[in-house]
Regions:
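Intrinsically disordered, low-complexity regions enriched in acidic/Ser/Thr/Pro/Gln residues
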Residues: 1-123, 127-128, 132-135
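Positively charged, proline/Ser/Thr-rich regional signature most characteristic
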Residues: 124, 137-144
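Catalytic beta/alpha-barrel core
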Residues: 73, 138, 163
Length: 174
């Protein structure tokens, strides 16, 4: 996978979660990051529960070509017939547009890599008071979101405590 070499443990955790390979942080026993010499290659090894490993072996999705519309690598369109669980939190429907405008005004300044390179996407976790609690960046928009989700899993954050803001388009699978 091509990713920016920061927050790799969070990326691995978030990626495993969003791909349905794990259900919770406790499913992951260990994450090892191994730089490979002087090149850009880094190996990330993850040790998961035996149940999660069996699920991984049974998966029928290739992860090549994961950018784009979300259809690449999907074995069947039945994948898209799955309905996401309803969010019992009503805060999202009452999100104040002024609060969102204020967050957006600060959002770009908080993107350190983007400000240095102009080439990254960001995903941020924002609480209902408008504070950017966490922000992760990557050259790939999916990767930035996976890094953020991994960071949230590491902190045992609850989805109803805030919302996600991304600097890119949010395609179907995101």
């Amino acid at each position: 996978m091509m990713t920016t070499p920061s927050d790799l443990a969070e990326f691995a955790l978030g990626f495993a979660y969003t791909e349905g390979l794990i259900e919770r942080r406790a499913d992951v026993y260990d994450i090892e990051i191994e730089p490979q010499g002087h090149g850009a290659a880094i190996i990330v090894r993850m040790t998961v529960s035996s149940a999660c490993f069996a699920q991984l072996k049974a998966a029928r999705r290739t992860l090549l070509g994961r950018t784009g519309c979300g259809l690449c690598g999907v074995d069947s369109l039945a994948y898209f017939e799955q309905q996401p669980a309803a969010n019992p939190n009503r805060e999202a429907s009452r999100l104040d547009i002024g609060l969102l405008d204020a967050v957006l005004a600060r959002f770009e300044r908080l993107q350190i890599m983007r400000n240095q390179t102009g080439t990254t996407h960001a995903a941020a976790w924002v609480n209902w008071q408008g504070e950017v609690v966490l922000l992760r960046e990557d050259v790939g928009r999916h990767n930035a979101l996976d890094k953020l989700i991994g960071a949230l899993l590491d902190r045992d954050a609850h989805p109803s405590d805030g919302f996600v803001l991304v600097s890119s388009r949010a395609s179907y699978e995101m």
